[in-house]
């Protein structure tokens, strides 16, 4: 069975702080002569089996502010023993009036698969998934492009974009 990390472990002390809920920047957080990825990212875990993720798909590429979109991804146990996997969903608002994090964990699903078995994991993305507090401390969902990211941990992700009108 797979156990997963609730935190990220940096490669070295020079890579601190290692977090993802930060403001985006044109410069990013880059270190010269160093690998920028954490040694063990949030959600990383070891298992006696392996899993393969298909490409994420959306029920529609556009939604209204009060609508919803269904994201689905196929996960397959490619190993020789049964195992558990935690599929994580992250969201990024690509352009907003308030600075938003690069990625936010907005959902996860635990699944159990036998060897060779595959399952389609679905997430409903709606107003509650996309809302945030604006400068007037009002909950809002702004129209624009959003990126949904899905995968087993915070760095091994596949993304897909959609538009909120």
What are these regions (language model features)?
Residues 65, 115, 142-143:
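Surface-exposed loops/turns
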Residues 80-97, 103-105:
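Short acidic, flexible loop segments centered on an aromatic residue
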Residues 59, 107-109, 137:
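Short, conserved secondary-structure segments in the cores of folded domains
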């Amino acid at each position: 069975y797979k156990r997963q990390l609730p935190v990220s472990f940096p490669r070295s002390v020079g890579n601190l702080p290692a977090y993802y809920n930060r403001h985006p920047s044109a410069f990013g957080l880059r270190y010269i002569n160093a690998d920028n990825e954490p040694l063990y990212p949030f959600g990383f875990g070891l298992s006696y089996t392996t899993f393969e993720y298909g490409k994420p798909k959306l029920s529609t590429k556009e939604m209204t502010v009060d609508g919803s979109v269904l994201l689905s991804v196929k996960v397959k146990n490619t190993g020789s023993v049964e195992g558990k996997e935690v599929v994580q969903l992250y969201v990024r608002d690509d352009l907003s009036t308030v600075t938003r994090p690069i990625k936010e964990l907005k959902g996860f699903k635990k699944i159990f698969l036998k060897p060779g078995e595959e399952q389609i994991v679905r997430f409903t993305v709606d107003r509650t998934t996309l809302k945030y507090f604006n400068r007037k401390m009002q909950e809002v969902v702004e129209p624009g492009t959003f990126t949904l990211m899905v995968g087993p941990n915070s760095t091994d992700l596949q993304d897909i974009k959609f538009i909120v009108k």
